[in-house]
């Protein structure tokens, strides 16, 4: 039997999430699967997400791969999907929700409350920028791009940012629990 070809972005987090979905499908249906890595505009462009047009920069190549028959299905973070989808595509399943909180990964055990005034916080999310500005208007918020591992690698050396605010859901899937502050 031909394996189900499942499209995924190539980041460690994306392949971990896709592997989880693919293995669950195999367990429940007996279908074999094959992961197919698709490079997206968001993966290869270094500009801010806002300058790239925001939603869809990570999903458009995956959507095209499904429509063109390169893959049979694709797994992607729902938050990055545009609200309007082609009529020929369907969101066929949504896995159980992971941790919905955002996480602060900071040096020396600092928390959002104990960050020094004017601390530099890196995030690529306009939503997180708004939340951080509301809670700590004194912080310097810096646009940051890259996968979770790349962004976290910037924290210990403090070359650019005092800390980083990613989604907590990405952490257990990427084995990053040790750097998340509760």
Where are these regions (language model features)?
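Domain-level signature for soluble enzymes in the chorismate/prephenate branch of the shikimate pathway
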Residues: 1-182
């Amino acid at each position: 039997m031909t394996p189900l070809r499942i499209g995924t972005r190539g980041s460690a987090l994306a392949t971990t999430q896709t592997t989880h979905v693919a293995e669950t499908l195999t367990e429940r249906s007996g279908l074999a699967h094959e992961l197919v890595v698709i490079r997206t505009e968001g993966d290869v462009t270094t500009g801010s997400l806002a300058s790239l047009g925001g939603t869809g920069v990570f999903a458009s190549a995956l959507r095209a791969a499904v429509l063109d028959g390169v893959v049979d299905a694709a797994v992607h973070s729902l938050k990055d999907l545009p609200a309007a989808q082609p009529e020929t595509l369907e969101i066929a399943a949504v896995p159980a929700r992971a941790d919905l909180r955002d996480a602060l990964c900071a040096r020396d055990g600092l928390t959002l409350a104990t960050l020094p005034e004017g601390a530099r916080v890196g995030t690529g999310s306009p939503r997180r920028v708004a939340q951080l500005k509301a809670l700590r208007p004194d912080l310097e918020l810096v646009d940051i791009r890259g996968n979770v591992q790349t962004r976290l690698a910037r924290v210990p050396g403090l070359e650019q940012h005092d800390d980083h605010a990613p989604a907590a859901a990405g952490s257990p899937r990427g084995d990053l629990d040790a750097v998340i502050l509760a």
